[in-house]
Amino acid sequence: MNFNEELKQRVEQINALLAEKLPAEEGMQQRVAEAMNYSVNAGGKRLRPMLLLEVYRLLGGNDEKIMEPFMAALECIHTYSLVHDDLPAMDNDDYRRGKLTTHKKFGEDFGVL
């Protein structure tokens, strides 16, 4: 397998992991879950979770399932930093990765959340 194929496969695995860990868009928190899912699923290279897993392996880890919550959390924290960077009080960006920023689609209050 070449590098690009490996990278694509890992991104797909991380996207599946995030879909499993993120909340369902239903119930009383539906709008919050929609904003969270929109933000996290806006794209990206998913390098941070990949690097975390590789460091774990480098240090002798062999049970990848143990790392899944940490990988998902790391990607969510990174996404949070991007959402906050886009807010009007910071860069006031309207688009990220070709899509409306979270605060433009859901309102500034959801961008802060």
Predicted segments, located by residue:
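Double-stranded RNA-binding/processing signature
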Residues: 4-7
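Mg2+-dependent prenyl diphosphate-binding active-site environment of isoprenoid biosynthetic enzymes
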Residues: 12-113
